């Protein structure tokens, strides 16, 4: 998969275009994305989110996939528009939640919008956690740990500082991970974590 060959179905394309237009109209009253990325939203946000789709684990009955700090809906809403049906978009900001609900309505996405902080989510309820441009890897692991099932995974796209974040996180956690090169930036990687546990400082 590469940036030049990435494509969507006609229906997905239409819904994603509606979604992008909605972001631009709401951006005037709610800060959804960086202003400098508005003109390059398709590559910078949509494709950057969509590339996660084939990295997600199979849907597990009775469990969900949390998008923590969903903000404007990247990556979760894009993945839902592409057909993923177990997503819960978690966003603590009420105005951003209002936007997400409107985007869900306009695109008819099969997704749950929850105005909630990650710390308040039910334990052991997710088979995967995703997050994009939310917090450091170490903080994301701290938030994700109680939410995941035993075989749950974390999928976190990270930018130019991915290596620094990973090294810092490894001071606090034993991490079983693999890297997938981002198709939207040569300096970025997607960190897929299949298993992790806190390092016991008492040892």
Residue ranges and their predicted role:
Residues 101-102, 141-143, 167-168:
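Short amphipathic alpha-helical segments
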Residues 50-131:
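Conserved SAM/SAH cofactor-binding pocket of Class I
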Residues 23, 79, 158:
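Residue-level signal for inorganic ion chemistry
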Residues 141-153:
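A short glycine-rich, Lys/Arg-flanked "PGG" loop and its adjoining helix->strand segment in the class I
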Residues 151-162:
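Conserved beta-strand signature within the Rossmann-like core of class I S-adenosyl-L-methionine
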Residues 88, 161-203:
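Active-site capping/gating segments
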Residues 96-98, 137, 162:
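Short alpha-helix immediately C-terminal to the canonical SAM-binding loop
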């Amino acid at each position: 998969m590469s940036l030049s060959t990435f494509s969507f179905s006609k229906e997905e394309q239409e819904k994603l275009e509606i979604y992008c237009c909605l972001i631009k109209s709401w951006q005037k009253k709610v800060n959804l994305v960086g202003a400098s990325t508005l003109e390059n939203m398709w590559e910078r946000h949509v494709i950057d989110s969509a590339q996660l789709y084939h990295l997600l684990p199979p849907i597990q009955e009775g469990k969900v996939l949390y998008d923590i700090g969903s903000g404007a809906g990247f990556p979760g809403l894009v993945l839902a528009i592409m057909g993923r049906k177990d997503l819960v978009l978690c966003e603590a900001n009420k105005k951003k939640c209002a936007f997400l609900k409107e985007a869900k309505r306009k695109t008819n996405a099969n997704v749950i919008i929850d105005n909630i902080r990650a710390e308040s989510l039910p334990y052991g309820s997710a088979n995967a956690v995703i997050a994009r441009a939310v917090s450091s890897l170490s903080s994301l692991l701290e938030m994700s740990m109680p939410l995941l099932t035993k075989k749950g995974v974390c999928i976190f796209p990270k930018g130019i500082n991915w290596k620094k974040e990973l090294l810092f996180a490894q001071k606090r956690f034993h991490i079983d991970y693999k890297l997938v090169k981002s198709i939207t930036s040569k300096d970025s990687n997607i960190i897929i974590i299949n298993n992790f546990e806190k390092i016991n400082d008492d040892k």
